[in-house]
Amino acid sequence: MIEVAVQAEPDWADGTDWERLAIEAVTAAMRTTPHAAMLDAAYMAEVSIRLTDDDEVHALNRQYRQKDKPTNVLSFPMVQDDLIEGLDNSDDGEVLLGDIILARGVCVREAAEKGVPTAEHATHLIVHGTLHLLGYDHIEDDEAEAMEDLERVALATLGIDDPYAITED
């Protein structure tokens, strides 16, 4: 089973059901991977999502990635990707897959630039972050293409258009 714990700062209160959105995004992302069975596993896998401000994400980005600026999403995996397959053997029946942290200001700005609702862009970022928790990355071009393909599939199941499509104005 999967549990998605959402903590949203007050500036995220815009009428969106962030908990529902996060659960749907995490589930959609997981279903696109070989780890989909985790959704129905006997153990409880938890993903923690924090919706916060640019200042907090800036500080975390500086501390953990040595990048002195805010970013849209940070992911902090708690399970090494090569150990995910063995989670069925978890002693206590629970495992924290990791944390996903979104920056409100960056998310709102990027959504406006893309001409999409903030909730739609945040969904994409949560899908992206979930894939990072499952061991996917985009350092190399082939990894980036594979990860983007998974994102497209997950988002399509949620009725969200390809975020990487180039549109002509």
Swiss-Prot record:
Recorded GO CC terms: cytoplasm
Name assigned to this protein: Endoribonuclease YbeY
Main location as per UniProt: cytoplasm
UniProt KW keywords: Cytoplasm, Endonuclease, Hydrolase, Metal-binding, Nuclease, Ribosome biogenesis, rRNA processing, Zinc
GO BP: any one term: rRNA processing
Superkingdom of origin: Bacteria
EC nos: 3.1.-.-
Underlying gene: ybeY
One Gene Ontology MF term: zinc ion binding
Cofactor(s) this protein cannot do without: Zn(2+)
Cofactor binding note: Binds 1 zinc ion.
List of residues binding Zn(2+): 128, 132, 138
Family, as annotated: Belongs to the endoribonuclease YbeY family.
Provenance organism: Rhizorhabdus wittichii (strain DSM 6014 / CCUG 31198 / JCM 15750 / NBRC 105917 / EY 4224 / RW1)
NCBIfam families on file: rRNA maturation RNase YbeY
Entry function: Single strand-specific metallo-endoribonuclease involved in late-stage 70S ribosome quality control and in maturation of the 3' terminus of the 16S rRNA.
Subcellular localization, as worded in the UniProt entry: Cytoplasm
